[in-house]
């Protein structure tokens, strides 16, 4: 690692007024959005990525990373104050955060959440800085066969993120893989499933309009449906916040939870598709198991909040490791960041550490800056963020819809993209309605073309002999890990479903 270049990259990024401003705005927007139940960091990044096209790479990445980190912390605000996690990853925070609020310790819970989230983010950024170059060095030996098996490994993670039904997750992924085949064949340029008159689909379905439709427009449609049915209940909080940071006594008590949570979050975040919602519960369970008083967890103690929030934001650095070093997104937000890099003419992966090393180091600096901005935003606004949970959804949904459609249009200045955005909004709404997960679609949409291109290249090199791939140790490692991920995920999900069925039967008895 070139430490002089790393330090100069930090100096360049942290002294750039545009980067500072964009990252701060991103952190502020992320916290505000994350505090509203149902509004995730993924949605925030998807909404704003079209508006980053006119910026240079690092200011735009700073904006998106600010939203990412801010949104991860923002979800804890509503979880603590009104027992409604703003993001899925904040679900474990309410286990101790909300009981603290009911004890009259809302300010303390929010300050612990903010401090732990910042520390977890810093741990994740540091691990990313020193680990991702090592992974990239290993990946320099990858050829088309290894890249194909890497994509297969990434696709195998779909089973892990499919939720209650593996079958529905696979159906979502299969649907997305079919979408990837629309447009010009990447190897011979022959149009597939379109005519030459359908110019809007020559390059396939544009990533950003599809993404905005699936994650933002679908939520607007679902929200309007809830309002019409009278199922959308406005939630308010009247808590007065006094402390902006935990006192030294509390910090001494929670630092082991922060350290372990940050490391757990980072390493789970580095597994493509795992995500913060898994990391927070693993961290919470580990913290509870290691405690001398596990019976206190769930009654409202700072240790529980610290363990979950440090893991929550630690995932941000972890998820960037496979993105930068392998070109495989670690979660849905880094999948969007992958699209942002590609649209700026930079392809993440091992070659990025050879041809774009200063850019890589500036991304490291931008992530650290994003966590610092999140802390500043939290300190300045923690007394007022409680008001965010009281925003009427009737006012919020039209604003989100307008921003979504403008974002879809702004990419190519093409009304066709707006139609694609709306169409995928309806598809996303229907899939959510019938409990088909959306994350597998996103993962398959990113990895599908990578899988196809490298498979065709490999088969051409090997003259049709696919089984020659068994001679590559790296490819076989990815294949083995993919099989283990699938088997473990199916086994684990079947256990969860059986336990849920047994609990339901017990309640009905």
Regions found by a protein language model. Name each.
Residues 1-60, 133, 140, 194-301, ...:
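Helix-loop-helix hairpins and the membrane-proximal interhelical loops
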Residues 41-51, 64, 79-99, 130, ...:
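Re-entrant/interfacial helical elements at transmembrane boundaries that shape
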């Amino acid at each position: 690692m070139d430490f002089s270049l790393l330090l100069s990259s930090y100096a360049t990024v942290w002294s750039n007024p545009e980067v500072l401003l964009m990252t701060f705005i991103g952190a502020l927007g992320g916290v505000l959005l994350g505090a509203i139940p149902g509004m995730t960091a993924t949605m925030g990044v998807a909404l704003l990525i079209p508006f980053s096209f006119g910026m240079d790479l690092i200011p735009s990445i700073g904006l998106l990373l600010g939203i990412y980190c801010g949104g991860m912390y923002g979800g804890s605000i509503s979880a603590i104050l009104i027992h409604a996690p703003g993001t899925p990853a904040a679900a474990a925070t309410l286990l101790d955060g909300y009981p603290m609020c009911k004890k009259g310790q809302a300010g303390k819970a929010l300050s612990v959440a903010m401090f732990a989230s910042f520390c977890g983010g810093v741990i994740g950024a540091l691990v990313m800085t020193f680990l991702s170059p090592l992974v990239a060095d290993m990946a320099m030996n990858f050829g088309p066969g290894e890249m194909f098996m890497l994509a297969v490994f990434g696709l195998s993670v779909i089973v892990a993120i499919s939720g209650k039904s593996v079958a529905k997750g696979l159906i979502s992924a299969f649907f997305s893989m079919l979408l990837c085949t629309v447009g010009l064949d990447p190897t011979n340029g022959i149009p597939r499933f379109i005519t030459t008159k359908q110019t809007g689909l020559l390059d396939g379905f544009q990533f950003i309009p599809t993404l905005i439709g699936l994650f933002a427009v679908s939520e607007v449609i679902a929200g309007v449906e809830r309002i019409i049915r009278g199922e959308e209940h406005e939630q308010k909080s009247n808590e007065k916040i006094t402390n902006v940071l935990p006192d030294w006594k509390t910090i001494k008590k929670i630092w082991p939870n922060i350290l372990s949570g940050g490391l757990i979050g980072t390493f789970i975040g580095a597994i493509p598709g795992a995500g913060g919602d898994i990391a927070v519960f693993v961290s919470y369970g580990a913290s509870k198991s290691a405690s001398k008083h596990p019976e206190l967890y769930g009654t409202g103690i700072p240790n529980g909040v610290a363990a979950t929030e440090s893991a929550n934001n630690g995932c941000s650095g972890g998820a960037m490791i496979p993105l930068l070093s392998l070109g495989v997104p670690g979660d849905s937000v880094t999948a969007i960041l992958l699209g942002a890099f590609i649209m700026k003419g930079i392809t993440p992966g091992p070659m990025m550490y050879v041809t774009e090393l200063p850019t890589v180091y500036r991304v490291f600096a931008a992530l650290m800056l994003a966590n610092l901005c999140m802390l500043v935003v939290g300190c300045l606004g923690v007394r007022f963020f409680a008001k965010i949970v009281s925003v009427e959804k009737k006012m919020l949904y039209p604003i989100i819809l307008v921003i979504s459609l403008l974002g879809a249009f702004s990419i190519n200045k093409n009304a066709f993209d707006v139609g694609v955005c709306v169409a995928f909004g309806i598809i996303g709404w229907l899939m959510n309605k019938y409990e088909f997960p959306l994350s597998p679609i996103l993962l398959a949409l990113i990895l599908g073309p990578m899988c196809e291109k490298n498979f065709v290249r490999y088969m051409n090199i090997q003259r049709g002999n696919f089984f020659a791939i068994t001679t590559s140790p790296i490819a076989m490692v990815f294949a083995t890990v993919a099989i283990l991920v699938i088997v473990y995920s199916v086994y684990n999900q079947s256990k969860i479903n059986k336990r849920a069925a047994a609990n339901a039967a017990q309640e009905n008895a």
